[in-house]
Regions:
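Active-site phosphate-binding/coordination module
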Residues: 2-96
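Conserved acidic, metal-coordinating active-site core of Asp-based
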Residues: 77-189
Length: 190
């Protein structure tokens, strides 16, 4: 952290690029000398914590809730967390009930899919690893338009906007801020 503070004090720009949402990234922003907009939601958004505003957002398609429902109908053993710009919604309480040991997020809000009215940024599918192959085969066969499914851990598959990525968002951020060069350092914080 001291090296980052020195870097920033000499005019460097430091940002975070993460799959987390705005409020789940905020504790990291408060711990580190972040002085530049951050890439969040796996590249689905760029958020400036200094002005508290989104500079870019890529939402899931409007009909993505139908995709989630179809996946839930086909795989009733999974739990789904639907994520909008502000909240993580534990659909029907399945994550807390069945996957609390692998996704112990206490900040989720229990909701039904039909209750969600806001645009979604991503969907998190929690499942036991033995279902991953069958799940991925199902979504690949369905070819849901406008989204992609990415396994990100043994118990988690994320549904993301088709063209969002951290790399694409970093490119957009560089263009917006007229940055000519970028370096990336992976930093794992506990």
């Amino acid at each position: 952290v001291q090296a980052l503070k020195r870097f920033v004090s000499k005019g460097g720009h430091f940002a975070i690029s993460t799959g987390r949402g705005r409020e789940f990234t905020r504790p990291l922003v408060e711990q580190l000398p972040v002085n530049f907009p951050c890439v969040i939601f796996n590249g689905g958004a760029i958020y400036d914590y200094s002005t508290e505003e989104y500079l870019m957002e890529i939402d899931l398609p409007a009909h993505s809730s139908e995709y989630i429902q179809e996946v839930m109908d086909r795989f009733p053993q999974i739990a789904v967390i639907a994520v909008d710009a502000d909240h993580y919604f534990d659909i029907d309480g399945g994550a807390a009930e069945h996957y609390g040991d692998v996704y112990p997020n206490k900040s989720t809000v229990k909701a039904a899919m039909s209750d969600l009215k806001s645009k979604l940024m991503k969907g998190l599918m929690l499942l036991h690893p033995q279902w991953t192959e069958e799940f991925m085969a199902f979504v690949e066969e369905k070819k849901f338009p406008g989204v992609r499914f990415v396994p990100t851990s043994p118990h988690l598959i994320e549904m993301l906007p088709e063209h969002s990525s951290k790399g694409n968002a970093l490119q957009k951020l560089m263009e917006k801020k007229k940055i000519q060069a970028l370096t990336e350092q992976y930093l794992k914080l506990m």
